[in-house]
């Protein structure tokens, strides 16, 4: 069954105001009266909805659906600006894997340099990608996107998290294997966890020092060196095993 995220309150009848969503529903998918879809409103609750008026783009809400697929903890993925379209790939995949927020920051060793204007366009593009991935993976929410123009603004946000894990390849080389487990252990439902990943060139010693000063722990992600766009996927997959599949 098709799923769509819609703005506003869950009150029948629901009129689809967003032009792109409406186009996909009634021109691409060719929905007709009495067809049913899943609508997700701002409250994150899924509801079964039935088309009652194609021309008016209206649905009636049939029932709430007990289907919460979100991770039990809120995970933010923060990546140093990578080259090309790697952040688009990261956004799509970590959305599918359950991230609540997706952040980007200018790393000391980032090759990509984006000013305010470019960042605005990038955010718009990433938001569309996150929306599509959230619909495809039947999420209850769409991850929020934030790209920081200044690293100082990013660092100022770190105090808001219950736990911070920095993916650091030097830790992997040293055979470290327990930091990720320790960082996740004991986190209660709804806790806020931040994963920080470097760009292609990795994280500088100065950045590591700044993150550790904020209480971050350094964690290796297995014995192999992962690409900038692969590491977030590994981390979220491992986290899912720890907080979902083992319970």
Labelled PLM ranges:
Residues 34, 94, 130, 211, ...:
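Residue-level signal for inorganic ion chemistry
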């Amino acid at each position: 069954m098709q799923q769509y995220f819609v703005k506003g309150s869950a009150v029948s009848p629901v009129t689809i105001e967003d032009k792109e969503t409406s186009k996909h529903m009634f021109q691409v998918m060719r929905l007709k009266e009495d067809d049913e879809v899943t609508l997700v409103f701002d409250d994150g609750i899924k509801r079964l909805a039935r088309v009652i008026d194609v021309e008016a783009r209206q649905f009636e809400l049939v029932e709430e659906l007990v289907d919460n697929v979100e991770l039990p903890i809120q995970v933010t993925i923060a990546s140093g600006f990578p080259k090309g379209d790697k952040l688009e790939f990261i956004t799509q995949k970590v959305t599918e894997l359950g991230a609540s927020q997706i952040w980007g920051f200018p790393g000391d060793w980032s090759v990509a340099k984006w000013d305010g204007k470019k960042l605005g366009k990038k955010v718009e593009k990433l938001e569309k990608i996150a929306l599509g991935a959230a619909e495809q993976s039947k999420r209850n929410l769409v991850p929020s996107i934030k790209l920081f123009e200044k690293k100082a603004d990013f660092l100022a946000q770190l105090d808001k998290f219950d736990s911070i894990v920095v993916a650091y390849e030097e830790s992997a080389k040293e055979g470290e294997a327990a930091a990720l487990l320790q960082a996740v252990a004991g986190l209660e439902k709804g806790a806020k966890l931040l994963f920080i990943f470097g760009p292609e060139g990795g994280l500088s010693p100065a950045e590591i020092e700044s993150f550790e000063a904020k209480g971050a722990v350094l964690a290796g992600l297995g014995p192999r060196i992962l690409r900038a766009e692969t590491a977030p996927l590994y981390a979220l997959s491992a986290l899912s095993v720890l907080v979902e599949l083992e319970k």
